[in-house]
Amino acid sequence: MSGVSEEDPEGLAPQGLPALGGACLATMDKKLNVLTEKVDRLLHFQEDVTEKLQCVCQGMDHLEQDLHRLEASRELSLAGSGSTPPTTAQAAWPEVLELVRAVRQEGAQHGARLEALFKMVVAVDRAITLVGSTFQNSKVADFIMQGTVPGRKGSLADGPEENKEQAEVAGVKPNHVLTTGGVQADASRTLWEESQKEDIPVRTVEGLPLIINTSLKGADLTQAGASLRQGVEVLGPGQVPLPTEAESRLPETASENTGATLELSVAIDRISEVLTSLKMSQGGGQETSSSKPDCWLSEEAMRLSSGPLPQPLGPLTPDSDIHSGDALPRIPINMQEMATPGELLETQSGSPIGSAEAPGLGTVLEDQIPKGARPFPPLPKRSSNNGGMSAEEEIGSGAEPMRGPSLATRDWRDETVGTTDLQQGIDPGAVSPEPGKDHAAQGPGRTEAGRLSSAAEAAIVVLDDSAAPPAPFEHRVVSIKDTLISAGYTVSQHEVLGGGRFGQVHRCTERSTGLALAAKIIKVKNVKDREDVKNEVNIMNQLSHVNLIQLYDAFESKSSFTLIMEYVDGGELFDRITDEKYHLTELDVVLFTRQICEGVHYLHQHYILHLDLKPENILCVSQTGHQIKIIDFGLARRYKPREKLKVNFGTPEFLAPEVVNYEFVSFPTDMWSVGVITYMLLSGLSPFLGETDAETMNFIVNCSWDFDADTFKGLSEEAKDFVSRLLVKEKSCRMSATQCLKHEWLSHLPAKASGSNVRLRSQQLLQKYMAQSKWKKHFHVVTAVNRLRKFPTCP
């Protein structure tokens, strides 16, 4: 007894479910067959449409050639006949009418453009008017344009004659201002009267080659300020005297001979007097021979430094009113520099005035007087770190601190160009008598911080993670032409870009546009070779992706095909692996691998298998960038579902196990090649390379590979996981291109870059965009505020 009943010899009676499952599978198989047939019909329909488009293109080419021939024959007939027959002239009338209509249409278009331009000009005019009204209603604009200072009277428009008349009517002696440098100093009326009563001797000191006249020239004033600064440098650091009253005031009445000028004899004589006494006390330690004793100078300097400044300084105004409301006459002074030192200072009245090594008329160097009897203490030196130190901190306890902003000082860097630097709110000790002391006195903290920041910026490497640039031409459907390539292109036979089993690639140039292209010359021997080239052209006609090379034109001859393609000059990716001057990091490999996966993903979306992916078939866009393009679609095949495709070609070390075993190929076949390329980029080694091709294929069939301990030391586990999930013998277990792009290793590039002390270019562009957006936002806010300011404000 076998244990099986006679009624059911096969033992299948109680098993009803398997039979039902078989019926379901049969139904599913039928549906799959129907779906396969539909897909095949769609593919055939697509091929038919492509062939018809090619026929249409060829017909258009033939029609264009016929039109050219017809035009040539018509031109020959016109040249042969001496005069145009009436019928030809009548036939040309409609063309003339069409040209006239076209001219009228263009005229109407130009009129519309002119009208739009006129509207734009009107809008700009309104905007300018709005800006002008806003600027006029602004107090800052009044301060800049008219020279008015809050709490003062007068402006730049006031003339010297009017101010002098106002001063005479008021009957009060005004405080005078040296207008050459915009410097103002307040002095008490007691000092002014004492100086008027005294008989000031005339002194002469050699060393200041200046002649002061009473004509107004702005350029000469700046030269005078620079020359007087040279006189200050002779005294040495820390020994510049304080400005006394005589330095900051001018004679009251104008000269009778020239009604618009004032003598400077008293002020310059006081300068020469003070500095001569200082020089004599330094040279021989003798007693100074000034018209007033040291105690008077100390008292006078103390009054000047501690006297209250009733009004803040305004811009460089040649005439400003005193606090009592009286007008101050403008003093036009012309300073002319002489080449020979030792000349005398002369006024227009002809009396020689002793020159002195003093601060320039356009510059007043200040200092504080501590308690004690020394009239001229040295200038305290400070660095830029204590730029906020006020004058009250440096003045002695016995003296009253100076109130109001300090006087304007002239920066030594601007003396050569004659500009004036207003340094309001800076203590007088900040003025360095020697020009070279400014930068030398800066604190080391800022310098060290600048060095550290510059070193940190230099250490950060910027990686360009942007997408590959598109082809310099629009995507086109190319039809193979049977004309000569030399008619439209110039092929450089001596400049070979690459080569392989198919032939060679030369650089070429389009004659009409000068566009640089690449010419791939493929040798054909039989009908099968021609079909393969046509298949390559058909596949490239369907590809339009930045990581895939683009086809531009195609030509056919008796023994070869020439494909005109996009040109890139970065070289093969294989060179990046083998060349010692290129040091690939893991982040570089991430950028390369991601673009390879994007190109393969596009191919697989269009049911195309590349089947020959390797570093030699991947070109870099530039010598140092990270943008790539996949080339060589000669072995590419269209993948058709339910159609068992087998291939027996390819480079041995990049072949998938199913290709070596001559099994069916599909999308995972390309992903195996992607895994091999990634392994090579990470380590520089080939995972399956043997001494012979047979040994290499044996390693591939057995999937015999591992991570080299030395080369993969220090690489992330994510990179190893990425390679391990691609180099799998079973096709269904490999990652697809979509899964590769979603893998952790190819994601989160900014975080990986920050961990590697690398900055991505996309991050820089984003930061720049955010900064520009923020700037625009602030600009709009300021614009809105300025528009609101056009409304009248309360007085």
UniProtKB/Swiss-Prot annotation:
GO terms for molecular function: ATP binding; calcium/calmodulin-dependent protein kinase activity; myosin light chain kinase activity. Its cofactor is Mg(2+). It is found in: Cytoplasm. Residues 236-257, 305-328, 367-452 are annotated as: Disordered. Keywords: ATP-binding, Cytoplasm, Kinase, Magnesium, Nucleotide-binding, Phosphoprotein, Serine/threonine-protein kinase, Transferase. It catalyses: L-seryl-[myosin light chain] + ATP = O-phospho-L-seryl-[myosin light chain] + ADP + H(+); L-threonyl-[myosin light chain] + ATP = O-phospho-L-threonyl-[myosin light chain] + ADP + H(+). SMART domains: S_TKc (SM00220). ATP binds at L497, G498, G499, G500, R501, F502, G503, Q504, V505, K520. It is an enzyme of class 2 (transferase). Restricted to cardiomyocytes (at protein level). Down-regulated in heart after experimental myocardial infarction at the protein level; no significant changes at the mRNA level. Gene3D superfamilies: Phosphorylase Kinase, domain 1, Transferase(Phosphotransferase) domain 1. GO terms for biological process: cardiac myofibril assembly; cellular response to interleukin-1; positive regulation of membrane permeability; positive regulation of sarcomere organization; positive regulation of tight junction disassembly; sarcomere organization; sarcomerogenesis. Its EC number is 2.7.11.18. Belongs to the protein kinase superfamily. CAMK Ser/Thr protein kinase family. Kinase that phosphorylates MYL2 in vitro. Has been proposed to be calmodulin-dependent, although MYL2 phosphorylation has also been observed in the presence or absence of calmodulin. Promotes sarcomere formation in cardiomyocytes and increases cardiomyocyte contractility. This is Myosin light chain kinase 3. It comes from Mus musculus. The gene is Mylk3.
